[in-house]
């Protein structure tokens, strides 16, 4: 599946940014960092590489660099659907436009498109981990069977990604055998929902706190998570990142 052509689907809604201010900020960051943007035209028949030249907030438009040839430029102008994809800080950014028009920018030919009403942000789940806020701990209940008895072990999350979590086992009750899978683990993601997942132990780190207490930090991978689970996780990651960005910029 090509995300560029499918990002208008409802499945993308958990990852969609609709705030005009956030859309402008994202697109402006892409332009200021000179990130190349892939433009798909004619429903995937043609692709060109462009860049964001300017955001015109007064007219709600985005100015883009032209294609290298007149023929390709005309194909862009003739297209009734334009899809865009780029990467910003390991986050895939997707947006679209119904059409483009030609214009001049700093005495050079350019394209102008309407400011997108929304932008999709997709984390690269295999790389991106978000530390959970200390002010709103994320709980994870892990069913653990030992000697024929199943107990519910309460843990908290140190971090989370689209591929797994890092558990903090303060009482060191869980087995840390690499490859062991815990079924039906329940994670409560504040503001996003409850997920039930299978967690497989991938690594373990024993830590000694300043008070001398020893704890285990267990890195776990999601095993066959559902699309709904991944959507909920991504929704939570996006929420946390927005809150962190708001604090960093003094808006939170």
From Swiss-Prot:
Similarity comment: family membership: Belongs to the YcgR family.
Subunit structure: Monomer. Interacts with the flagellar basal bodies.
Subcellular location: Bacterial flagellum basal body
Name of the molecule in the record: Flagellar brake protein YcgR
InterPro entries named among the record's database cross-references: PilZ_domain (IPR009875), Split_barrel_FMN-bd (IPR012349), T3SS_YcgR (IPR023787), T3SS_YcgR_PilZN (IPR009926)
GO terms for cellular component: bacterial-type flagellum basal body
Span of domain PilZ: 123-238
HAMAP family: YcgR
Any GO BP: bacterial-type flagellum-dependent cell motility
Species in which this protein is naturally found: Janthinobacterium sp. (strain Marseille)
Name of the gene encoding the protein in the UniProt record: ycgR
GO terms for MF: cyclic-di-GMP binding
Function: Acts as a flagellar brake, regulating swimming and swarming in a bis-(3'-5') cyclic diguanylic acid (c-di-GMP)-dependent manner. Binds 1 c-di-GMP dimer per subunit. Increasing levels of c-di-GMP lead to decreased motility.
Keyword terms, alphabetized: Bacterial flagellum, c-di-GMP, Nucleotide-binding
